[in-house]
Swiss-Prot record:
One of its GO terms (cellular component) is cytosol. This is tRNA (guanine-N(1)-)-methyltransferase. InterPro entries: Alpha/beta_knot_MTases, tRNA_m1G_MeTrfase_C_sf, tRNA_m1G_MeTrfase_TrmD, tRNA_m1G_MTases_N, tRNA_MeTrfase_TRMD/TRM10. Belongs to the RNA methyltransferase TrmD family. S-adenosyl-L-methionine binds at residues 114, 133-138. Its main location: cytoplasm. GO terms for molecular function: tRNA (guanine(37)-N1)-methyltransferase activity. It is found in: Cytoplasm. The lineage of its organism: Bacteria, Thermotogati, Deinococcota, Deinococci, Deinococcales. It comes from Deinococcus radiodurans (strain ATCC 13939 / DSM 20539 / JCM 16871 / CCUG 27074 / LMG 4051 / NBRC 15346 / NCIMB 9279 / VKM B-1422 / R1).
Amino acid sequence: MLTFSFLTLFPELLTPFAQEAIVGKARERGLIDVRLVNLRDYAQNKHLKVDDTPYGGGAGMVIRVDVAARALDAACQAGPRPDEVILFTPAGERFTQQVAEELANKQHLVFLCGRYEGFDARVEGLVTRELSLGDFVMMGGEAAAACVLEAVARLRPGVLGDEASHQQDSFSSGLLDYPEYTRPPEWEGHSVPDVLRGGNHAAVARWRRDQALERTLRRRPDLLPGAGLTPQDSAALLALGVTPEQLSIWDAPPPPAPKVRRKKKPSAEDKAPTDTSSE
C-alpha cells in the first residue's frame, strides 16, 4: 500500500480529493492511504501561529522551520519510513508522468504544502526532493498536492478498473493520447471515423497510433524524440510532412522499405507459342 502524507495549513482543501471518486474508493479498498497533517497542531503557542516576518524585511510571512520539522517528525512516526519528503515550490523539478510513475513505486510519500511566502529556507534540509507543476505561482501547495495525488494514485495496481488504461494515456506512451469517440455515431454533421466501427482491431490500433502521432506533431513536437518511434511511425510522420532530415534529428528509424511485387513466372503453357494458323 502507498501512503500519502500531506503537511498543510488547510487540510480541508485536500479532504474532498482524498474521500471522493476513484481516490476515495481506493482508500476504502486499502489500496492507498491518505493522511492530512495540520501544521497548526505543531505550533506550540497559544494562538497556533506557524509563521513569522522574514529576516531582512519584505512583504508576507514565512512558515517556521521548527513547526515544519515537528509536523514532519509526527508524520514519520505515524507511518512507515518515508521514501521521499517532497516540497512543492516553483523552483523545484518539473512534475511529469515519468516522475509520477517513479513515485507510484514507493511506499510512503510525505508532501510539504506551503502558503504565504513559503517555508523558511532551512526546510530544504528536511526534504529529499522539490517539485513544481510548472512555471507559475499559486497561493499554496494544496492544489499541486491534489494533482500529484491523482496522478500517482491512479498508477497503483488495482486503483483503476482497467489495468491497461493508464498505459494508453498521454505521455505514458511518449505521445499525446489519440481522440476517443462514443455514441451517437452522428452528431450535428460530425461522424465517428469508419475505421473505429469496422471491427478490424489491427486497423484500429494503427489509426490510433497515427492519430497520436499527428496530434503530438501538431501540439507537442518536443515529445517525439523520446517517444520510441517505430519504422511504421516514421512512415506515418513522413506522410504528415515531416522531412527525412527531421526524422534523423529525432533518431527515428527509417521507414519500412516498399514492398516490391515479384512478377509471376510464366508457366509452360504461357511459354508455348500460340497457333494462329487456320485449318
